[in-house]
């Protein structure tokens, strides 16, 4: 079985990198990445920059994205603009996009990676908790996509990749809120691909599985989730890595996928087909993880 590419657990750049794609695949492109200060979004920014792209990374904490940007610039030599923005607030989105366009003069790629999630039975889910996840995942994705379309993509074309999830593919216990929010984003992907395709705008979703070294995995499964994976029969029996997700996003964002639009690319080692889907099993998983 092929070994996964090297990765690091925290929000740090890779100590070394071997190109699997042409190093100038995204030469002089500019990518606007929500949630780019940590986790999957951070690694997407790094991999894009290692392939010639400049990036704008946005998040609610300016300090966090500024720290991340310094790491990215030091590791890749490309430009990275950190901006504070809440995807739920359209005026903030408009301001951030204006700042990015002022800095770079263009935005070629949008990665919607901002998200929020937690485990909760539907019966215990508060109105506000459900709304919060939908506001970040679904409304936030629409807000940023809409603003970028009006300010640049409508006249110049572009690429949008929405980071979603496999939760809605079969229904998942304890994940009604996130599953519903991400399913809506996948539907949005298809609608926008149809409506905006004639203006040379490609729109796709990428649905990761369980990915090591992410805050999402730590929140959902405990700090030692990796060691528990062997108890489940994933077709590819390991966690995915942030670098693997970033490589898949790189493909969708690049000219390699020039005729790909309106799809949901699942990158989870096949786990959506076999992951346990009973409350008892998942609660046991949580209990086991908490003791490790």
From Swiss-Prot:
Phosphoserine found at: 287
Reaction(s) the record says it catalyses: a (2E,4Z)-dienoyl-CoA + NADPH + H(+) = a 4,5-saturated-(3E)-enoyl-CoA + NADP(+); a (2E,4E)-dienoyl-CoA + NADPH + H(+) = a 4,5-saturated-(3E)-enoyl-CoA + NADP(+); (2E,4E)-hexadienoyl-CoA + NADPH + H(+) = (3E)-hexenoyl-CoA + NADP(+); (2E,4E)-decadienoyl-CoA + NADPH + H(+) = (3E)-decenoyl-CoA + NADP(+)
Modified residue annotations for N-acetylalanine? 2
Predominant subcellular localization, coarse grouping: other
Amino acids binding substrate: 60, 88, 118, 126-128, 219
Subcellular localization(s) per the UniProt record: Peroxisome
Q: Drop me one GO molecular function for this one.
A: protein-containing complex binding
Q: What Pfam families has UniProt attached to this entry?
A: adh_short_C2 (PF13561)
Q: Where is this motif: Microbody targeting signal?
A: 290-292
The EC code for this enzyme is 1.3.1.124
PTM N6-acetyllysine: at which residues? 64, 151, 291
* Any one annotated GO CC term: peroxisome
Q: How does it assemble?
A: Monomer, dimer and oligomer.
Described function = Auxiliary enzyme of beta-oxidation. Participates in the degradation of unsaturated fatty enoyl-CoA esters having double bonds in both even- and odd-numbered positions in peroxisome. Catalyzes the NADP-dependent reduction of 2,4-dienoyl-CoA to yield trans-3-enoyl-CoA. Has activity towards short and medium chain 2,4-dienoyl-CoAs, but also towards 2,4,7,10,13,16,19-docosaheptaenoyl-CoA, suggesting that it does not constitute a rate limiting step in the peroxisomal degradation of docosahexaenoic acid.
What protein am I looking at? Peroxisomal 2,4-dienoyl-CoA reductase [(3E)-enoyl-CoA-producing]
Originating species? Mus musculus
Q: What is the gene called?
A: Decr2
């Amino acid at each position: 079985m092929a070994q996964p590419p090297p990765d690091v657990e925290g929000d740090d750049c890779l100590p070394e990198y071997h190109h699997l794609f042409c190093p100038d695949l995204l030469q002089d492109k500019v990518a606007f990445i929500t949630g780019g200060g940590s986790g999957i979004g951070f690694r997407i920014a790094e991999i894009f920059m290692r392939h010639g792209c400049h990036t704008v990374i946005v998040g609610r904490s300016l300090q966090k994205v500024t720290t991340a940007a310094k790491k990215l610039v030091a590791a890749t030599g490309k430009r990275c603009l950190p901006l504070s923005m809440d995807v739920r607030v359209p005026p903030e989105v408009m301001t951030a996009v204006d700042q990015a366009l002022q800095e770079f003069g263009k935005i070629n790629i949008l990665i919607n990676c901002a998200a929020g999630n937690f485990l909760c039975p539907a019966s215990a889910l508060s109105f506000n908790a459900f709304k919060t996840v939908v506001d970040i995942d679904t409304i936030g994705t629409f807000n940023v996509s809409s603003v970028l379309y009006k300010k640049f993509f409508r006249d110049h074309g572009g690429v949008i990749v929405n980071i979603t999830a496999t939760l809605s593919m079969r229904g998942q216990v304890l994940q009604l809120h996130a599953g519903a929010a991400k399913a809506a984003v996948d539907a949005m992907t298809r609608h926008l691909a149809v409506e905006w395709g004639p203006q040379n705008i490609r729109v796709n979703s990428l649905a990761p599985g369980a990915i090591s070294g992410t805050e999402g995995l730590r929140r959902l499964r405990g700090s030692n989730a990796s060691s528990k994976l062997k108890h489940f029969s994933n077709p590819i029996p390991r966690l995915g890595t942030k670098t693997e997700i970033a490589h898949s996003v790189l493909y969708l964002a690049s000219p390699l996928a020039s005729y790909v639009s309106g799809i949901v690319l699942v990158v989870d080692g096949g786990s959506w087909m076999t992951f346990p889907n009973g409350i008892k099993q998942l609660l046991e998983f949580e209990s086991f993880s908490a003791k490790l």
